[in-house]
């Protein structure tokens, strides 16, 4: 009608959008000064780089590592993605940066491993197969990722939960022997024969105490019962369930 308007409220509409990651060049300018009397030159030191004489910042290095190991994105695919953004990075360059990143964080990894393995009374251990591409062959081999977990929340312990990982090209029993060389205590694990050397009296440092994993034991009875309806397997499942009930009642208590 042409009359004046007054605000009476508002409606808000939201939508989810995505802003792709962007590269940026961080430029550090370090001015140099010379003493008028003695000509001595002073200048702030160059910023630290995780990659010696490299041009990758910490954010980019972290992104490459997470994309590779957490998102399972091979370096050649990362290179293709970065090229779409106008940044050409050879896979050999990315590989070198990744190796330098691993070297830079290794002291923290070693500290975590010592704290978890040597500083724990009870550990949970397991391994999982990992396909590994064999360079130059186009084929994959089966490596192993070993995980050792400390979690004292079940019995009211004071130490925080933590996990450490080791990678190996195979599943030989010498692997857990080396991983747990500094550990002394109880190991909760499945019945894999490769762990048996840890429970042997001939183990340097003494035998570990074996605590078999009930979840793995239960799985065998569950499979038999599902396939055959065995009453014996059903009885075993019921008894294991009763043990689980006791554990739930004790959870978190010292």
Regions found by a protein language model. Name each.
Residues 1-32:
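Charged, often Cys/His-bearing segments associated with DNA-binding zinc-finger transcription factors
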Residues 6, 27-34, 39-254:
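Catalytic center-proximal scaffold of phosphoryl-transfer enzymes
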């Amino acid at each position: 009608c042409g009359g004046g308007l007054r605000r009476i409220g508002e409606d808000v509409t939201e939508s989810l959008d995505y802003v792709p990651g962007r590269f940026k060049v961080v430029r550090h300018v370090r001015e140099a000064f010379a003493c008028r009397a003695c000509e001595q030159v002073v200048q702030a030191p160059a910023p630290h780089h995780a990659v010696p004489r490299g041009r990758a910042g910490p954010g980019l290095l972290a992104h490459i590592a997470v994309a590779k190991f957490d998102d399972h994105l091979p370096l050649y695919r990362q290179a293709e993605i970065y090229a779409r953004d106008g940044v050409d990075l050879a896979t050999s360059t990315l590989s070198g940066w990744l190796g330098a990143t691993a070297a830079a964080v290794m002291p923290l990894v070693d500290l975590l491993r010592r704290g978890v393995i040597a500083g724990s009374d009870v550990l949970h251990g397991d391994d999982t197969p990992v396909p590994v591409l064999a360079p130059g062959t186009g084929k994959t081999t089966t490596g192993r990722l070993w995980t050792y977990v400390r979690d004292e929340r079940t019995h009211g312990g004071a130490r925080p939960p933590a996990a450490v990982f080791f990678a190996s090209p195979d599943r030989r029993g010498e692997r857990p022997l080396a991983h747990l060389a500094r550990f002394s205590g109880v190991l909760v694990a499945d019945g894999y024969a490769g762990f048996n050397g840890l429970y042997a009296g001939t183990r340097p440092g003494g035998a570990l105490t074996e605590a078999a994993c009930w979840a793995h034991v239960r799985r065998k009875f569950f499979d038999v019962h599902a396939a055959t309806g065995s009453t014996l397997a059903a009885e075993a499942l019921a008894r294991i369930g009763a043990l689980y009930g006791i554990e739930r009642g004790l959870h978190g208590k010292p």
